[in-house]
């Protein structure tokens, strides 16, 4: 049985969609590691440390969830964390092709690493970090898409 899973991402910022998937994963696995990718090529708005802190805040009520920043290959991070499952979110059919390729690449790099795909609740299916940042950038109210502390951080980091 798989007891340790990783939910990787940039989480710039963490959204209600991410939080929804984390809650679902926490019910399915004994321990969930949220792996926050440093990913400097994406030019994140928040530093790795800020993203870790925001995710720790959002997941503080989940005893079996741990938040860890990482750089390098995801499969190497999974080995370090002794995880055998990657949790990935699928918002729409358009996400599937990329996620399918990614799952096959990860399996090729580490044959004992499985990918599990979860879908968010319908009310979160359209939310993306990119859209949330865009709304915040133009002064829009993002409170319905992110945790209140994340909304506050976005407003001070525009």
UniProtKB/Swiss-Prot annotation:
The keyword ATP-binding applies. InterPro entries: Cyt_trans-like (IPR004821), PPAT (IPR001980), Rossmann-like_a/b/a_fold (IPR014729). GO terms for molecular function: ATP binding; pantetheine-phosphate adenylyltransferase activity. Its main location: cytoplasm. This is Phosphopantetheine adenylyltransferase. It catalyses: (R)-4'-phosphopantetheine + ATP + H(+) = 3'-dephospho-CoA + diphosphate. HAMAP family: PPAT_bact. Belongs to the bacterial CoaD family. It is an enzyme of class 2 (transferase). It comes from the Bacteria. GO terms for biological process: coenzyme A biosynthetic process. PANTHER family: PHOSPHOPANTETHEINE ADENYLYLTRANSFERASE. Keywords: ATP-binding, Coenzyme A biosynthesis, Cytoplasm, Magnesium, Nucleotide-binding, Nucleotidyltransferase, Transferase. Its cofactor is Mg(2+). ATP binds at residues 10-11, 18, 89-91, 99, 124-130. One of its GO terms (cellular component) is cytoplasm. Homohexamer. Substrate binds at residues 10, 42, 74, 88. The keyword Methyltransferase does not apply. The record marks 18 as: Transition state stabilizer. It holds the Pfam family CTP_transf_like. It is found in: Cytoplasm. Its EC number is 2.7.7.3. Pathway: Cofactor biosynthesis; coenzyme A biosynthesis; CoA from (R)-pantothenate: step 4/5. The gene is coaD.
């Amino acid at each position: 049985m798989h007891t340790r899973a990783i939910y990787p991402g940039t989480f710039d910022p963490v959204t209600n969609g991410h939080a929804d998937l984390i809650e679902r994963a926490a019910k399915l696995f004994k321990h969930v590691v949220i792996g926050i990718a440093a990913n400097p090529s994406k030019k994140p708005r928040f530093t790795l440390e800020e993203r870790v802190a925001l995710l720790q805040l959002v997941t503080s009520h989940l005893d079996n969830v741990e938040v860890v920043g990482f750089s390098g290959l995801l499969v190497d991070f999974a080995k370090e964390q002794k995880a055998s499952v990657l949790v990935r979110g699928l918002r729409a059919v358009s996400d599937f092709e990329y996620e399918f390729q990614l799952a096959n690449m990860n399996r090729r790099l580490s044959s004992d690493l499985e990918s599990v795909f979860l879908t968010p609740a319908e009310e979160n299916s359209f939310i993306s970090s990119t859209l949330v940042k865009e709304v915040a950038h133009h002064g829009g109210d993002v409170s319905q898409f992110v945790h209140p502390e994340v909304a506050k951080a976005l407003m001070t980091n525009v």
